[in-house]
């Protein structure tokens, strides 16, 4: 059944101009997996008749059961294009054979880390948008991620069959709906566009927008119709294509094109007249069983149908006719091949985003030229659990060189620093494998520009890594991925039977490997904590942990717990001072809140410890109103050296200051990771070292004296600066009909949420509601919401920002102070906070 073998696939891997690496991205339930099926069917991996129902790329049992994609799945497809299809193709190519490495990614926001992993190893993206629902929150998130990785998008307006069957809209109305959808997508693309990518917006008349119905397996771009009419009427194809979109009207009575509607009954817009109406007529003829009418249309359009197909009725008949006339695969493939870049093109502009080292060394050059003879550069973006329990494939993409079976590679983990031994391994690749949906084919080697799965490296890679040849000791790693969501929801897990503990520890290690986002840690109280992006994400992680990684051993999970952050509201009331244990050193300090937007800038990586100090002080001075000299005196960021807090040196002429800098920084990393209120991370606090008095003898000012003192003085300054708690807040988008709005508002009010935008979707009875909802209140939110709106409302939650809690945690009996004692109790600390007098000393 499969129309190609692994050897054919391997042969074409060398023609880097004939490869397309692309991912399918969209909002949840807009039909990614279903559309992918048509493409898979065209390559002959599944039968055409069942395409759309199999959802080939949903390989896990729970994916099929829930009807959502959870993990991104790769599949390599091989196509032979006809000469006429490639006539207008301008780029370089070798022959007519194309290899498309396609990755189907999840749409659900809890799994957006899977999307990031998929985008990193592809160059183009097919953005799927439901023609009725339009561009939603998640569409925007994934588009922003894609453009951030410099990935060129093409759009398909999916679920066209809804227009014909379910809603029965007329042509003009359909046209305005589609135009709105495309316009909304373009607005997002223009907002996040990158000057190096050029214009990334999509235009139907240029062939970068397709119209599809994934479930029925048909699709078209305007060029399909332009070709058809060009040969029929003998007009120029490109001219015809421009006429099929925009303000172009045709009146069959006068046989003239105009740019305005002349008002005659027969005068219709080009798109409606030549694309929408013919499809509508054929579908109507099929659904109403008007066989003779249908046959007339079919012969006119030159569709060849088998005799037994003519005996079908209703939907199956329509599906066959439409698939034969406008097969989804050819329209979408043509669009991908013409408008998405090959690795050779894409790596030229993506190298700056990918490679951490200097842009003129051997490695950067090899990536830029996509050179198979250069040194190996391979990025592993995720680990895929293999079918035999406990083993993992490392799934990634070769950016330069070749990776082959049995070769020795140098593995650089995410914490690797060039020139050091930390997080570095040299190991053998046992097998190189290419992925074909549910099965894998072993190949000898894989050259650059392709995706690959490697066997035998799973012990050394946690989530992602950079691989190069064993001798290349001066290679820098490829930049780590930025995730658009952060793990804010945590649960504690323990075994039901105490003897299963080793299984749990091992299982947690494997879980951390298999999911790009999840964080597993052990608290000081000995609890095992799993942190994820949301309720659904955690649910899937726990299911994987129990069934796959622990062999079904039972686990007990606590209620979900939310991470908080600690911050300050004002500058410290006074300069606080702490003395070292031997009373010979004194540190003076103040705390103040950071400027608006600065903490977010540090989170996004626009400002950080690795920046050039000149650039950094320029940004701080221009955007946040810092003093230029002050901006050069930032000692460090924290927690984890990159977090959104910092220490600034304000001292004037202090001796020996540099000697204690390291000790103060160490104390700061400790303090910022566990704040004074409830040992949660600090956020958005800027500490200013005002003065330091040190002992002249070096022996009296060692780390043992300074580190604890520094930590105490950080706590004291935090407590004198009106400390507050920050709680994480979700942005919730809800789609619902008008009669469900009352229920939505009441549920949101119970849960301390507030609505900030309500819009009616033009042309539909649905409303789009956006609201903020504290993560603490979000557990069970979707089930409560469905219950009170009788299942008509669908929420999507994305982590959005940190919101300050209004009450004062230092005031007994306030909401914040009860919350603090709850958190402290859970962590096994004293319920009462340590008072300020413990941290601050008097002269």
UniProtKB/Swiss-Prot annotation:
Pfam families: EFG_C, EFG_III, EFG_IV, GTP_EFTU, GTP_EFTU_D2. The keyword Isomerase does not apply. It is found in: Cytoplasm. Gene3D superfamilies: 3.30.230.10, 3.30.70.240, Elongation Factor G (Translational Gtpase), domain 3, P-loop containing nucleotide triphosphate hydrolases, Translation factors. Keywords: Cytoplasm, Elongation factor, GTP-binding, Hydrolase, Nucleotide-binding, Phosphoprotein, Protein biosynthesis. It catalyses: GTP + H2O = GDP + phosphate + H(+). PANTHER family: EUKARYOTIC TRANSLATION ELONGATION FACTOR 2 (PTHR42908:SF10), TRANSLATION ELONGATION FACTOR-RELATED (PTHR42908). Belongs to the TRAFAC class translation factor GTPase superfamily. Classic translation factor GTPase family. EF-G/EF-2 subfamily. This is Elongation factor 2. It comes from Beta vulgaris.
